[in-house]
């Protein structure tokens, strides 16, 4: 049994209004001996699930893949590329670092541009695979309301469930329209936040770049901790050599 990301919707009315929660990925569950398929420990994200497609045109040297929406939860961005000749679909993953990246690494980079929008960047064929000419890039993502969606705990499922059914020599997804049980939610929604203020970006960006994702000095910790725990308000770090008596080789956060 599969639960599709597209249209996979959970609705909840809370104090701040009515909100939609979605899943960015297709989720699959295998029925047990009792014939019941259980979807467990599923993370759902506040916001509407959207998709955007781009056609790769090598003749356009300035071709850009810009997502038209603001307030995108960048952790939910998913990218796939369909070859225009063979129809083969390849999934691309977000860059984490460039270690062991080669010309066939299927990776993409998210770059924030003006007006709080995002551009999707790909490799050049040397560092990362370059989508072939004529292929179709499909980007899916969730547009969120930030912190307003926090506190939801009871949901109504209004998405799509299906199961694979053989139709001759072809296996097709067949919708499930009955015998769907209620949802169990172990905790209320949390950690939703608004887009990072420009002042924070200006302060942290050079420090993150200088640290190169290595935590050595106190300043390194100040810049890296927010990327690990994005919902903290502020960070202070200092070296043990500033204490009395000094504690060399330690950093306090």
Features from the language model and the residues they span:
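Extracellular/luminal ectodomains and secreted, surface-exposed scaffolds of diverse proteins
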Residues: 76-123, 127-129
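A generic structural motif
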Residues: 21, 118-122, 251-253
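Short beta-strand and beta-hairpin "edge-sheet" elements
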Residues: 12-26
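Buried hydrophobic packing residues in well-ordered domains
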Residues: 10-11, 79, 137, 225
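Single conserved hydrophobic/aromatic residue that forms the stacking wall/gate
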Residues: 1-10
């Amino acid at each position: 049994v599969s639960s599709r990301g597209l249209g996979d919707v959970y609705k909840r009315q809370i104090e701040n209004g009515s909100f939609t929660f979605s899943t960015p990925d297709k989720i699959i569950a295998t029925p047990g001996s009792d014939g019941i398929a259980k979807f467990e420990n599923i993370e759902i994200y506040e916001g509407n699930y959207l998709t955007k497609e781009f056609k790769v045109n090598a003749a356009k040297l300035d071709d850009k893949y810009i997502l038209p929406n603001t307030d995108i939860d960048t952790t939910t961005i998913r990218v796939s590329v369909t070859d225009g000749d063979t129809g083969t679909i390849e999934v691309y993953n977000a860059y984490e670092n460039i270690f062991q990246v080669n010309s066939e690494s299927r990776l993409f980079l998210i770059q924030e541009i003006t007006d709080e929008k995002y551009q999707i960047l790909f490799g050049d064929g040397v560092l990362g695979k370059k989508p072939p000419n004529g292929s179709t890039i499909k980007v899916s993502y969730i547009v969120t309301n930030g912190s307003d969606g926090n506190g939801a705990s009871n949901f109504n499922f209004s998405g799509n469930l299906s199961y694979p059914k053989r139709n001759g020599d072809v296996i097709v997804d067949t919708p499930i329209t009955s015998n769907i049980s209620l949802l169990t939610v172990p905790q209320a929604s949390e950690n939703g936040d608004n887009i990072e203020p420009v002042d924070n970006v200006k302060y942290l960006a050079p420090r993150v770049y200088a640290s190169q994702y290595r935590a050595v000095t106190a300043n390194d910790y100040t810049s890296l901790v927010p990327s690990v725990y994005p919902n903290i308000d502020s960070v202070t770090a200092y070296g043990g050599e500033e204490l009395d008596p000094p504690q060399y080789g330690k950093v306090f956060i």
